[in-house]
């Protein structure tokens, strides 16, 4: 029987603690109890600030516990394209911060003793076209030259050492990328926050933020509170309560499926090194073995619709998986689920302040790494820490033209990307 909730929830069900009364005031109010909001809350509480976190759902029920569990910290543009478009200084700054963010997440998990199956196994990125392989090989050379990441290209003749598939024309391995269990990671972060004195109000949607002389009034479905500072951390689940941010983020459905248990010999063939996996499609597939090595977890952004309702988009995703792994043609699915990632015009994470409200958003599908990193950076900004600099602050954060939060254009964009992928353009 197929279950329509994330596979990750089997090991880490979403918490549903009793609601507590809203405090009349606090130092900082945070909207969003995912990785981003809780990372900020932990930093602020440890600095002695009183913090209330509000979420319209259960804590971590949205993207934080629905992802593929691939800790890449990738940016949408390759380093080669960034060099060409932005120049060496900016390109290196963006990519270097990604390296720092990955290391920060690893240190945090170890320091807090979070048991989330964190495993730095690396990631193989498959080249969908021969020309893509040449680009990946060049990318590996550039990453090693500028950052010494030990990335390497894998020709098609040797790719079975990395993946049991003939769907690709070689690829690249990034050994600096880890896998983890995202719901367990969130549970560990939530425990840190609660243990540090943070108050989390789940199922408490924020309806508006009003600036006042001495701070802000935050309106919720359960009452009002006053805060000296406000941090918005909803990312792909941003709603009408924060219209300025909503006009700058496009929520894109990202789908995932989990296979039934597989024979160990099949797993050894398909994922011989148990790496994280991806490819070079514009509508790229991301997939991996489960942490216990018993299943394939497969994701993609091919819905082409504003909401996911019914089996059609999952059937398409299932067919994509079988195209890569024909061995799975007769294997059943144990779980199917979906969530939103947040895209923006520049395809870069953003750390911003507007009218006194702090924002971190636009992780473009790589939130496991960027959410904690920029959530913490935002907290340091609130604290007035002059050393909390980031390459992702102070850059233009443009609104999407003719858009107010309803991505009416998304089906056409996805159809166009499917066309480009089909012809390798």
What do the PLM-derived regions correspond to, one by one?
Residues 103, 111-119, 206-208, 224-264, ...:
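Active-site substrate-recognition segment that forms the wall
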């Amino acid at each position: 029987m197929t279950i329509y909730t994330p596979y990750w929830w089997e090991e880490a069900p979403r918490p549903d603690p009793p609601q507590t009364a809203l405090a009349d005031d606090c130092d900082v109010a945070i909207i969003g109890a995912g990785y981003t909001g809780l990372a900020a809350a932990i930093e602020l509480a440890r600095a002695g600030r009183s913090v209330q976190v509000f979420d319209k759902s259960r804590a971590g029920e949205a993207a934080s516990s629905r992802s593929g569990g691939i800790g890449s910290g990738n940016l949408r543009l390759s380093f080669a394209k960034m060099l060409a478009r932005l120049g060496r200084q900016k390109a290196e700054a963006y990519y270097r911060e990604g390296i720092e963010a990955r290391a920060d997440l690893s240190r945090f998990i170890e320091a807090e003793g979070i048991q989330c199956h964190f495993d730095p196994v690396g990631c193989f990125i498959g080249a969908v076209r021969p020309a893509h392989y040449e680009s990946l090989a060049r990318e590996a050379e550039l990453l090693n030259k500028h950052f010494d990441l030990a990335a390497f290209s894998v020709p098609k003749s040797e790719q079975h050492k990395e993946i049991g598939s003939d769907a690709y024309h070689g690829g690249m391995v990034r050994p600096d990328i880890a896998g983890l269990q995202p719901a367990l990671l969130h549970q560990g972060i939530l425990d840190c926050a609660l243990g540090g004195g943070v108050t989390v109000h789940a199922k408490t949607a924020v309806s508006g933020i009003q600036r006042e002389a001495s701070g802000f009034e935050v309106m919720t479905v359960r009452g009002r509170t006053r805060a000296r500072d406000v941090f918005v951390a909803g990312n792909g689940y941003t709603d009408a309560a924060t219209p300025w941010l909503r006009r700058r983020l496009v929520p894109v459905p990202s789908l995932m499926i989990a296979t039934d248990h597989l024979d160990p010999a099949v797993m050894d063939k398909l994922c011989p090194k148990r790496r994280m996996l991806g490819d070079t499609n514009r509508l790229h597939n991301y997939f991996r073995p489960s942490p216990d090595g018993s299943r394939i977890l497969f994701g993609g952004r091919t819905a082409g619709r504003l909401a996911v309702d019914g089996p059609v988009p999952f059937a398409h995703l299932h067919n994509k998986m079988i195209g890569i792994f024909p061995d799975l043609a007769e294997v059943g699915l144990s779980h199917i689920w979906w969530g939103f990632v947040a895209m923006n015009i520049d395809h870069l994470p953003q750390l911003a302040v507007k009218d006194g409200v702090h924002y971190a958003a636009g992780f473009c599908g790589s939130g496991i790494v960027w959410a904690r990193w920029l959530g913490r950076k935002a907290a340091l900004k609130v604290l007035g820490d002059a050393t909390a600099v980031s390459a992702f602050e102070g850059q233009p954060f443009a609104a999407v033209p003719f858009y107010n939060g309803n991505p009416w254009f998304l089906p056409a964009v996805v159809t166009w990307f499917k066309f480009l992928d089909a012809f390798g353009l």
